[in-house]
């Protein structure tokens, strides 16, 4: 893969050598919630409770990343108890909710974990995510992201947000780091 323009065939389609090289160095994966971990729809109950659907495959990918020494964090603009519960279930300990300026949480994570920006991947779906995405080593937009975000990302998933896009990114990171086979048979 040393040739310029070379790519690696994956089960999701070809991935450029440049993206693979960036993915090799990722030690922290940061995720948005609405439109990334969920499909972006919010269901409101009669008593004001919020409901969102989370993809089990995304959860498995997150667990595999965590057990492969890749930290996972969430930075989201909204605040919801069910996101706290989902993080607890998956073992995500870095959760920043209600963040209208995601750069503040991003800076806090870098300092807390002593990680350089080039060792961070960020998955987003909308323009609120761009300020962080332009600072990380690997910026990822989900397939159904805002049209202005897609051309700015290093990698665009083939799968839509909430439908397995996070699993695709986790698999990409694990593949690039030679850890994908270690994930077989794990339980969440």
Swiss-Prot record:
Gene disruption phenotype: Not essential for growth.
InterPro entries named in the record: CMP-NeuNAc_synthase (IPR050793), HAD-like_sf (IPR036412), HAD_sf (IPR023214), KdsC_fam (IPR010023)
SUPFAM superfamilies: HAD-like
Short name of one Pfam family: Hydrolase_3
Binding site for Mg(2+): 32, 34, 125
Swiss-Prot/TrEMBL GO biological process terms: lipopolysaccharide biosynthetic process
Molecular-function GO terms, alphabetical: 3-deoxy-manno-octulosonate-8-phosphatase activity; metal ion binding
Pathway(s) where this gene product acts: Carbohydrate biosynthesis; 3-deoxy-D-manno-octulosonate biosynthesis; 3-deoxy-D-manno-octulosonate from D-ribulose 5-phosphate: step 3/3; Bacterial outer membrane biogenesis; lipopolysaccharide biosynthesis
Keywords, alphabetical: Hydrolase, Lipopolysaccharide biosynthesis, Magnesium, Metal-binding
A cellular-component GO term for this protein: cytosol
Tagged with keyword Disulfide bond: no
Domain of life of the source: Bacteria
Binding site for substrate: 34, 55-59, 63, 78, 86, 102
Substrates-to-products reaction catalysed: 3-deoxy-alpha-D-manno-2-octulosonate-8-phosphate + H2O = 3-deoxy-alpha-D-manno-oct-2-ulosonate + phosphate
Cofactor(s) required, per the database record: Mg(2+)
EC nos: 3.1.3.45
Description of how the protein assembles with itself and partners: Homotetramer.
Function: Catalyzes the hydrolysis of 3-deoxy-D-manno-octulosonate 8-phosphate (KDO 8-P) to 3-deoxy-D-manno-octulosonate (KDO) and inorganic phosphate.
Family, as annotated: Belongs to the KdsC family.
Protein name: 3-deoxy-D-manno-octulosonate 8-phosphate phosphatase KdsC
């Amino acid at each position: 893969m040393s040739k310029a323009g070379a790519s690696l065939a994956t089960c999701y389609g070809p991935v450029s050598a440049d993206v693979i090289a960036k993915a090799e160095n990722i030690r922290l994966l940061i995720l948005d919630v609405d439109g990334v971990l969920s499909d972006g729809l919010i269901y409101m109950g009669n008593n004001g409770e919020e409901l969102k659907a989370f993809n089990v495959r995304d959860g498995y990918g997150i667990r595999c990343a965590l057990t492969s020494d890749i930290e996972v964090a969430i930075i989201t603009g909204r605040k919801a108890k069910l996101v706290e519960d989902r993080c607890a279930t998956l073992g995500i300990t870095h959760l920043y909710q209600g963040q209208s300026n995601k750069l503040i949480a991003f800076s806090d994570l870098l300092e807390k974990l002593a990680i350089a920006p080039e060792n961070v991947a960020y998955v987003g779906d909308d323009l609120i995510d761009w300020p962080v995405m332009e600072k990380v080593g690997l910026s990822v937009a989900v397939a159904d992201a805002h049209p202005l975000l897609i051309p700015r990302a290093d990698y665009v998933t083939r799968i839509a947000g909430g439908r397995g896009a996070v699993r695709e990114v986790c698999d990409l990171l694990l593949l690039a780091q030679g850890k994908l086979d270690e994930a077989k048979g794990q339980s969440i």
